[in-house]
Amino acid sequence: MLGTLGLWTLLPAAAQVSPNRRTCVFFEAPGVRGSTKTLGEMVDAGPGPPKGIRCLYSHCCFGIWNLTHGRAQVEMQGCRDSDEPGCESLHCDPVPRAHPNPSSTLFTCSCGTDFCNANYSHLPPSGNQGAPGPQEPQATPGGPVWMALLLLGMFLVLLLSSIILALLQRKACRVQGGSDPEPGSGGDCSEELPELAELRFSQVIQEGGHAVVWAGRLQGEMVAIKAFPPRAVAQFRAERAVYQLLGLQHDHIVRFITAGQGGPGPLPSGPLLVLELYPKGSLCHYLTQYTSDWGSSLRMALSLAEGLAFLHEERWQDGQYKPGIAHRDLSSQNVLIREDRSCAIGDLGLALVLPGLAQPPALAPTQPRGPAAILEAGTQRYMAPELLDKTLDLQDWGTALQRADVYSLALLLWEILSRCSDLRPDHRPPPFQLAYEAELGSNPSACELWALAVEERKRPNIPSTWSCSATDPRGLRELLEDCWDADPEARLTAECVQQRLAALAYPHGASSFPESPQGCPENCLSAPASAVFPCRPQQSSCLLSVQQGPGSRSPDPVGDTVQVYVNE
C-alpha cells in the first residue's frame, strides 16, 4: 500500500527553510498535464527522485492519489496557488473526487504544515472499492497543541499589523489629499471625484455585472457613460488607471474623455467613466446585422490587429512612456465599430500593465498577487487553452498574456471573415455565429470548452471556399492557425498579425483596400487558384490563420445608424 511513499526523509530539511515559506513534497507522475513547478522553488533533498518545493504564492500543500482496485498511486504533490478552505489542516486528509474511469477514484488533500502532503492519514472508502487500512501520521506528542498555539500567535501578529497598516494608509491618504492608490494594491482611501454637473443621462444601452452603460451628453457631445455602483469602486479604479496612462491615445482604442461621479436622476451618485460613443455598436452586434465585402472585412480585421499591437507595445514617444498592456478580455462584445467601419478595442477593466525593459522605476507595475491574479481572464469562449487548463507560463507571465490575447484575436478574425460575402461563391454568408457556437452552442461551460479546445485541440471550422476565394490557397488559413496554435510559443505576435493583414489590405503598396479577392474557380475543392496571392507578404516571417460565422444584411452605408452600443 502506498502510504508514506518513503518521503519522510525530507523532513530534516525543513529546519533549513525560512519559517515564512511553506515547503511541500513535490512529485508529478509521467503524463500528468499541467505542471505546478512554477508555483514554487525546487528544493533537492538528495540525489534521489524525492524532491521538495518551497511555495511562492501560498502556505498550502496538496496531494492527489489515484485508487484503482484497492491500489493507491500518487499522481501529483506540490504547492497550491493560493490558500483556500482545507489548507488549515495539519495533516493530509484525502477527499474523494470523480474520475473518468469508473473503476478508479481520485483522492485529493490540502494541508498547511511542512511536508504534510508526504503521505495521507487514510483513504475513505469509495463505492465498492476497498480502501487501504488507516494510517495514522507519525506526530510528535503535543505537536498539534504547539502548532495551534503557533498559528494563533501568527494570526494575532498579522491582525495587529493589518490594523497598523490601515491606520497609516488612512493618514497618508489624508496628507496627500485623497490620492488614488495603485490598482490592485488593496488600498481603500476615499477620494473626491469631480462632480460632472453638465453630464446628462439619456438611455441605458448595456448592463453588466460591474457597471451600467448609458448614452448621454457632456458639454453638447454625445458620450457613453459607464456608471459603477459604490461596491465596484475597485473595478472603476483599475479601468481608469489604464485609460489614464500617458500615451494610450490611439484610433483603435476606445477614447477616454474623463472620470468623475454622478448619477441619473434619483439614483445614488457613483464613480463614472466617460468614453466616446460608437453608434454602430459592438462588433458582435454589427456582424449579426450586416455582411461585409472583402475591403470592409479587411478594414475591421486590420484595425483590430493594429489596436492590439499598440496595446502590447512598450515604447517612448515624444517624451512619454507607454508600457505594454495585456487586454485579457478580447471578445466581439468588447470591440466597437467606428463610423468608418474600423474597430476600436474597449473594456480595459481586466487589462494588466506588463513589466518592460525600458520602464522607468516610478512606473513599474505592481506584481500581480499570485497565479490567481495572473490567470484571471474575461469571457470563457475566447480564453486561450493555457488559461482554460491553467498551464500559462507564470515565469514570463507578461509574454504569456500577450500570446493569450493573440489567440482571442484569431477567434475575432474568424468571426469577421465568416461574414465576408466575397469569401462565398454565392456571396451569401450564413447567419452570424460566435466562435465555437456551432460546436458548443450559445452558452458553453468551462468543461466543454476545455474538452474541445484543450483536449481535442479543435478550432472553429475554416470553409474551403476561403482558400479558393483568395489567390493564395493557404493565406487566410495559415494566418488563423498560426494565431490560435495550441503551443503559445508558436503563435504570432500582434504586430506580426498587423503586418500580415496590411499586406493583404494593400497589395504591392496600393493606397486603398481591394474591393474583392480574386474570384473562386468553379470547383473550389479540387481546383484551388494557383496564382501567387498578391496580398501575401513576400519577405515577412509572420504567419496567419482564421474561421467561420453568421448572416443577414448586406454592408450598411457608412452613414447608417444602428442601435447604440458601447463596451462594458
From Swiss-Prot:
Cofactor(s) recorded for this entry are: Mg(2+); Mn(2+)
Sites carrying a glycan are 66, 119
Q: Which residues form the signal peptide?
A: 1-15
- Determine the domain of life of the protein's source: Eukaryota
Query: What are its E.C. numbers?
Result: 2.7.11.30
Enzyme class per UniProt? transferase
Its localization reads:
Membrane
Name the catalytic site residues: 329 (proton acceptor)
Entry's Gene Ontology BP terms: anti-Mullerian hormone receptor signaling pathway; female gonad development; male gonad development; sex differentiation; transforming growth factor beta receptor signaling pathway
Major site of localization recorded for this protein: membrane
UniProt cross-references to InterPro entries, sorted A to Z: Anti-muellerian_hrmn_rcpt_II, Kinase-like_dom_sf, Prot_kinase_dom, Ser-Thr/Tyr_kinase_cat_dom, Snake_toxin-like_sf, TGFB_receptor
> Which parts pass through the membrane?
148-168
Q: What are the protein's GO molecular function terms? A: anti-Mullerian hormone receptor activity; ATP binding; hormone binding; metal ion binding; protein homodimerization activity; transforming growth factor beta receptor activity; transforming growth factor beta receptor activity, type II
Topological domains, Extracellular: 16-147
Which reactions appear under catalytic activity for this entry? L-threonyl-[receptor-protein] + ATP = O-phospho-L-threonyl-[receptor-protein] + ADP + H(+); L-seryl-[receptor-protein] + ATP = O-phospho-L-seryl-[receptor-protein] + ADP + H(+)
Q: Does the keyword Ubl conjugation apply?
A: no
Provide the disulphide bond pattern. Answer: 55-79, 92-109
Per the UniProt topology annotation, the Cytoplasmic ranges are 169-568
Gene Ontology cellular component terms for the protein in this record:
plasma membrane
Q: Which PANTHER family did the record assign? A: ANTI-MUELLERIAN HORMONE TYPE-2 RECEPTOR, TRANSFORMING GROWTH FACTOR-BETA RECEPTOR TYPE I AND II
Q: Partners and quaternary state? A: Interacts with type I receptor ACVR1.
Q: Which family does it belong to?
A: Belongs to the protein kinase superfamily. TKL Ser/Thr protein kinase family. TGFB receptor subfamily.
What is the official name of this protein in its record? Anti-Muellerian hormone type-2 receptor
- Provide the taxonomic classification: Eukaryota, Metazoa, Chordata, Craniata, Vertebrata
